[in-house]
Amino acid sequence: MTAPGLTAAVEGIAHNKGELFASFDVDAFEVPHGRDEIWRFTPLRRLRGLHDGSARATGSATITVSERPGVYTQTVRRGDPRLGEGGVPTDRVAAQAFSSFNSATLVTVERDTQVVEPVGITVTGPGEGAVAYGHLQVRIEELGEAVVVIDHRGGGTYADNVEFVVDDAARLTAVWIADWADNTVHLSAHHARIGKDAVLRHVTVMLGGDVVRMSAGVRFCGAGGDAELLGLYFADDGQHLESRLLVDHAHPDCKSNVLYKGALQGDPASSLPDAHTVWVGDVLIRAQATGTDTFEVNRNLVLTDGARADSVPNLEIETGEIVGAGHASATGRFDDEQLFYLRSRGIPEAQARRLVVRGFFGEIIAKIAVPEVRERLTAAIEHELEITESTEKTTVS
């Protein structure tokens, strides 16, 4: 059943991508099947029942928030009227998460407050063999500004909704990191509401976990909004990492830029499934969204055999009175010419490969506003490349 006080949050929302159905009620959704468009890439059998109602909560995730001046953290129940202002679940798992969480964490930056230090939010999973559901809302009030780092650790089976409410003329940089243990299944639905002249920088990083699927809906609720969505992912043998985005331009003179990059490395000799990444990027420009300027890009670098990348950009335009709109997608292996150039200058092949991958991800890492996160990602990529080299040596021997 829909929680009291949330009906108003549902009313008036223009459901995006062909008026996609949305509800807080899990029973309003059918159980997903592989033929469903939004689930056709997702390995449903590996979701441990998150999609069909059989995954009952047996544990809980722990959420801790660092203390900062002007930042308030609250724990609230499902009936709190603020919940759902960022958006409404558009799939069964997100609705299941909303129907099943025990308490929600609200992090609020006060009006006209500029938070100097990043706000750290650590989410620790319920543990191996346990299932949990969660809800997090980050709210930046009018003229406020903050950087928030949401860091996922530990393991287990977890589904949640994450809301980003950015009020008029506010600015939020949100860095979402999935650095789970190898046994983790995590499905996360993000809902962003961007006010008039507000700015959202949304960065997702996927490194760990068995199956990690992040779906993000970004909704402009006033003119002059600006959204930048960045993503970095690195899939190993057996991993499924999936990103699904929808940017809904419903007001004039808004901008959006999407840039996601991923690398994959598998092991054809392994009994595990192939490394698999999925990126689906939807941009909707409504008839009233004149003056829109938008572009989206997805690039994938396949490092070994036993890896597969699916990339699906979509652009729907209902008005011709825009500044610009476009998309690009490419998946390929190492550029042989780049490798040849580097090796011809005496650089060993392994080091040359590292340089190419560093350059591939460097554009995104440089855009992340938190030095500690940049350093961490650089180290993580180096570690992944060590795995690549180890796999290649084993294959050769």
UniProtKB/Swiss-Prot annotation:
It comes from the Bacteria. SUPFAM superfamilies: Stabilizer of iron transporter SufD. The modification N-acetylthreonine is found at residue 2. InterPro entries: Fe-S_cluster_assembly_SufBD (IPR055346), SUF_FeS_clus_asmbl_SufBD_core (IPR000825), SUF_FeS_clus_asmbl_SufBD_sf (IPR037284), SUF_FeS_clus_asmbl_SufD (IPR011542). Keywords: Acetylation. Belongs to the iron-sulfur cluster assembly SufBD family. This is Iron-sulfur cluster assembly SufBD family protein Rv1462. It comes from Mycobacterium tuberculosis (strain ATCC 25618 / H37Rv). The lineage of its organism: Bacteria, Bacillati, Actinomycetota, Actinomycetes, Mycobacteriales.
